[in-house]
């Protein structure tokens, strides 16, 4: 069915309704993308029970863990899926590719796609000769080289998705044309230039306020949840262990000391709004609650230059706190822009009687 027909399709909640609705296309895409999802597991009370804090393996979420050898450096990459468009996921500072674990699993149930989540320089299981050069220039070169190492000349459409620092790098990577394949879309999660630049002043204090070490992985996961750093126990159990490293028996410290990279922080975010608006591909900005858009983004939003999505009841790490809702939004966005196809077509289920009646009336 063409976009024009979708835009004029009546509200089919009532068989007799003839009022057109411009938002019907979104409703149909949501139905097509989410149709067939298993019903959510009923929540259970944890009162009186000890919450499980053990580490979850990467293999519960991804299909493959691969090394990308680039000029003597070894970048660890998590991969899910073997066909379809490529979703290239870039994590924020201090995290790893496993921050996307729950989201990747959810997205793969909705659309046919490949998900690729590298550990960037200095993070996770990646090993580089210079672990602390997190400059914008070095990192976007890394991102381009990792992609080429994994996919070669694959010309499948690519959707670059980045969170926080990774969101800034996604924008810079796209504008610098570091990925030769067809970049079809850009999704940036919880990074706005104005807010990010303001937050940098308190970042060192925040980093020093965290525990310097943990006696075990379980204690680190417990801190991650109790501090509100993550709100999803499953995400914390797979992501938090990759953010720390064992330095001695019963002592784990942070994988990367982000304070040593302070000189690069400003370069990640400065001029980001104009660069974001200058990207010619379809764009979506995902925010954790209501954020203040700066002047450039406010004007751009009013002009329809990008889509905004606000997810409620989440912290900064949206992909960990609400992976299902984020996957729904990303899946709908990808289908709307013809980047991906839903795995579960509405045609696979018994047709809605209202739709049949509408088609009968209009001889479709």
From Swiss-Prot:
UniProt entry tagged with the keyword Metal-binding? no
* Catalytic activity, EC: 3.1.1.89
Q: Which residues form the active site?
A: 164, 190, 316
Q: Where is this region: Disordered?
A: 1-53
Q: Which Pfam families match?
A: Abhydrolase_6 (PF12697)
InterPro entries per the UniProt record, alphabetical: AB_hydrolase_1 (IPR000073), AB_hydrolase_fold (IPR029058), Epox_hydrolase-like (IPR000639), PPase_methylesterase_euk (IPR016812)
Family (UniProt)? Belongs to the AB hydrolase superfamily.
The Swiss-Prot or TrEMBL record annotates one GO molecular function as:
protein C-terminal methylesterase activity
Which class of enzymes does this protein belong to? hydrolase
Q: What is this protein called?
A: Probable protein phosphatase methylesterase 1
What does it catalyze?
A: [phosphatase 2A protein]-C-terminal L-leucine methyl ester + H2O = [phosphatase 2A protein]-C-terminal L-leucine + methanol + H(+)
Recorded hits in PROSITE patterns, A to Z, give: LIPASE_SER
Arranged from A to Z, the UniProt key words for this protein are: Hydrolase, Serine esterase
Ranges of compositional bias, category Polar residues: 11-23
UniProt function note? Demethylates proteins that have been reversibly carboxymethylated.
Source organism superkingdom: Eukaryota
């Amino acid at each position: 069915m063409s976009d024009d027909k979708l835009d004029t399709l009546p509200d089919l909640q009532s068989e007799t309704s003839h009022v057109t609705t411009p938002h019907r296309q979104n409703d149909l895409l949501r139905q097509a993308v989410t149709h067939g999802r298993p019903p959510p597991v009923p929540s259970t009370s944890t009162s009186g029970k000890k919450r499980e804090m053990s580490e979850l393996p990467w293999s519960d979420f991804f299909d493959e863990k691969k090394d990308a050898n680039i000029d003597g450096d070894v970048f660890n990459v998590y991969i899910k899926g073997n066909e379809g468009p490529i979703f290239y996921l870039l994590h924020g500072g201090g995290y790893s590719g496993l921050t996307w674990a729950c989201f990747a699993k959810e997205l793969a149930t909705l659309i046919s796609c490949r998900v690729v989540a590298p550990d960037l320089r200095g993070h996770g299981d990646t090993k580089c000769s210079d672990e602390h050069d997190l400059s914008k220039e070095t990192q976007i070169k890394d991102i381009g080289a990792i992609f080429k190492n994994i996919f070669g000349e694959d010309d499948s459409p690519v959707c670059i998705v980045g969170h926080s620092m990774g969101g800034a790098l996604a924008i810079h990577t796209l504008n610098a044309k570091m990925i030769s394949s067809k970049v079809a879309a850009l999704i940036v999660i919880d990074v706005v230039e104005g807010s990010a630049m303001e937050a940098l002043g308190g970042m060192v204090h925040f980093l020093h306020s965290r525990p310097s070490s943990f006696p075990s992985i379980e204690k680190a996961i417990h801190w991650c949840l109790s501090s509100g750093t993550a709100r999803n126990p499953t995400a914390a159990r797979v992501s938090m262990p990759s953010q720390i490293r064992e330095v001695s028996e019963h002592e784990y410290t942070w994988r990367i000391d982000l304070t040593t990279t302070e000189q690069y922080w400003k370069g990640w975010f400065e001029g980001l709004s104009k660069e974001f608006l200058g990207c010619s591909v379809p764009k979506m900005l995902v925010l954790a609650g209501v954020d203040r858009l700066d002047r450039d983004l406010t004007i751009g939003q009013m002009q329809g230059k990008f889509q905004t999505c606000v997810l409620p009841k989440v912290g900064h790490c949206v992909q960990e706190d609400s992976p299902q809702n984020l996957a729904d939004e990303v899946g709908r966005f990808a289908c709307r822009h013809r980047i991906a196809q839903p795995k579960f077509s509405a045609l696979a289920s018994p047709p809605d009687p209202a739709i049949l009646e509408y088609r009968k009336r209009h001889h479709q």
